[in-house]
């Protein structure tokens, strides 16, 4: 398995730069290698841009190597200028501590840390007590300013109006020091990262060679970019987070369902652990009948399962089916809860009201599906209202046997306007009444 790992990464489009390919391949074939990937805790969650790196680490682990996942508590205090047009806001220590704890937990969902099969580290543990003079003597003297100025990220910032601070200019030295420390203490021989990190990776390789006289390796993958050219997961608009409290599993699932047909094969290869033969089969099937969206469904299901687990992936799939015209009657309780988290909702009538039959008209108004009782009656007369997927007529009442899994009744007006009656409302930050869910 190890001998073909590089070939598998290349087949997935996950090799952009690397140190000598033959030497790297030979080292991987010779035995287990410790390989590291780092994430700076600039937020309290990782995003899908980080997911590629974690999945590459997972591929190395599945091939018998040892991942070293680094949460950059030290480098996060400085900020990486790579791919940025302006200075980062510096975070305080308490915020960084909370962010590091959060992203460590997310890393543990992708990698197996049992019995030392993977290692989780924080670079603040070996950086916090290093004095400035020690750092300048043991790291700074091995790196020339010429080398630092040659890095694309530095050149781009120097050419900008804002320029670059000494803090961010020094970032590559801190990351190079990480590689040196990890090599000396954990035997790390390979660093991986996105192509925007290649300059930082090379700085670490050079430092290990100069200080320890050892040949170590680096590998980067091409950046996945959004239509506006920004890095996936790092756009200035709505990010797609791995934390379900920031991006619900349903919205995470829908992100992948909305992938452009032209990107399906590439995303299946990079954002899932499916074998490349299965990826190619799905891509070919999708190309023949893109309207079936088999590729997007496989992508959404696999990516959501990896990040949120099988139950959440299934609930997101069922919620999607409901919100795009499917019947909620056969859906599970988790799927209905997911739907209730995405659309307007109103309290379910009491048991006594349900026993007597609750008038649907005021419920449509309360749920935001009608502006008035008159509007609600007109919608019913026009046959535009459904209860649990079944079109209803004027005079319809909500009764106990309409309640799904003891908690939910799904209402729909027209094709896209949904609301849910919920037995115990309780959720804060609910969508505003009258919002719509648009199909991809």
Give the ranges of each region predicted by the language model.
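NTP-dependent nucleotidyl-transfer catalytic core
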Residues: 1-197, 202-205, 212-217, 230
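Conserved nucleotide- and phosphate/pyrophosphate-binding catalytic cores
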Residues: 210-440
